[in-house]
Amino acid sequence: MGLSLVLSCGVIAGISGFLFGYDSGIMTTTIAQEQFLQQFKPKESMVGTIVAIMQAGGFFGCLTAGKLSDLWGRRKAIMFGCVFVVVGGALQAAAYHTAMLLIGRLVTGFGVGSLTMTVPVYQAEISPPRWRGTIVGCQQLMLAIGSAIANWTGYGCSFVNSSFQWRMPLALQAVPGIVLFFGSYFLPESPRWLVEHDALDAALHVVQRLYPDKQNLDSAYAEFQEIVEQIKQEKAQASERSYLQIFRRKAWRKRLFLGAGIWLMLNLTGINVINYYLTQFFTSLGYKGRRAIFLSGVYGSVGAATTFLALFFVHRLSRKTPLMMANISQTATLIVMAGLTAASELGKSGQMGGVAMIFLFFVIYCSTWGPLSWVYASEIFPTQIRSKGYSMASAVNCEWRFYFLFVATNFISALVLLFLYPETSGKSLEAIDLLFDDHQTIHRSTLEENEVRRTSESVNAKH
């Protein structure tokens, strides 16, 4: 019991992170497999769609899970997400045309998005304060392990000269979903959710089981009382806990902004672009075919090892400073990487330097932004809105929504053109000058009137 139980729960629930890492990573190698390319013959735009559509499903999965997690409890919400992961994996593995593959990716994305929202909240709510960073950080560790296994699975299957080359890796997506579904039966429910639903005796029992040893039972009871009082106070302050209410209350709005901001800044580091198109990056550096897939496997393994080591220190570190230092370090590596890839001809040393920068970037990410983003975003919301707030914040972690950035910029551009830009079609250059209120410009009508007047005076003088 105690710490061993907390760690076990963190790891079992963290299988959702494994799913996220595997499902994201497996397409990195799959889109480079010869048999996959022969089967679907995708154009470059379709490759992007196959990769990104999982994130579209994840967006809606995140939003849906917030409400379900409040209604059903964290455990049942986890099981709900697993069902979609298993069904989606089966559809992808059995796909014989692009539409079926896309539907499978969408369904899997919905399940992964649901789990991405629910599990970190669950991990944060069952963790003693001292160990919260480590327990929630298990999500990133499992994600890194899943990504590494996906890369090595793709590399191993690349030696098979049949559709098994890509069907088997996609089918394996369902396995961790099945394991997590049945493993959820053995997870204790979140004590905070139990208190929220007036199951006080059950909540106290869970808190006592989760504390490190019997000598801390008094501390466990004290934390239980703190949970009860906090939730009672939250209920008294605001009976309504809808999504709309989160935007109405200033304090909740700030938490949502900070939670979403963490995920937005994480994506703006560039990590997801590098991860999804890793084999293409290696190809551009001169490592093609199976060599690129092999390097992807090494890349994933380095990430898993780095994250594992980081978990021993994450509960002792502050949150903000490591993230800021990581941004500065990643900036430097990206500048060097850009310089190397911009070179018209890369020698052996240039190729190795580019690969080294990609690996260094990933090590920095896995030791800072990787684990700390999950921790910070899951712990800043109060119990009353934790699932809903985190669901909206984590929806920002679904990369497809960056298309909305271009939706917004296109719409704003249309408004700017409508209200600020004058029409120039069919006008002389001098008339266009007048549109900008240039007082030195003489309007054509004025010129014409003066010309008519001079002509008239000239005619009259002759007569």
Swiss-Prot record:
Family the entry assigns: Belongs to the major facilitator superfamily. Sugar transporter (TC 2.A.1.1) family.
Principal location listed in the UniProt entry: membrane
Keywords, comma-separated and alphabetical: Membrane, Transmembrane, Transmembrane helix, Transport
GO molecular function terms noted in the UniProt entry: carbohydrate:proton symporter activity
PANTHER family attached to this UniProt entry: PLASTIDIC GLUCOSE TRANSPORTER 4, SUGAR TRANSPORTER, PUTATIVE (AFU_ORTHOLOGUE AFUA_3G12170)-RELATED
InterPro entries, per the entry: MFS_dom, MFS_sugar_transport-like, MFS_Sugar_Transporters, MFS_trans_sf, Sugar/inositol_transpt, Sugar_transporter_CS
Top-level taxon: Eukaryota
Location in or out of the cell: Membrane
Originating organism: Aspergillus cristatus
One GO cellular component term: membrane
Transmembrane residue ranges: 5-27, 46-66, 83-103, 106-126, 141-161, 168-188, 256-276, 293-313, 323-343, 355-375, 402-422
Pfam families for this protein: Sugar_tr
Summary of the function given for this chain in its UniProt record: MFS-type transporter; part of the gene cluster that mediates the biosynthesis of echinulin family alkaloid.
Name of the molecule in the record: MFS-type transporter criB
Membrane topology (UniProt): Multi-pass membrane protein
Lineage: Eukaryota, Fungi, Dikarya, Ascomycota, Pezizomycotina
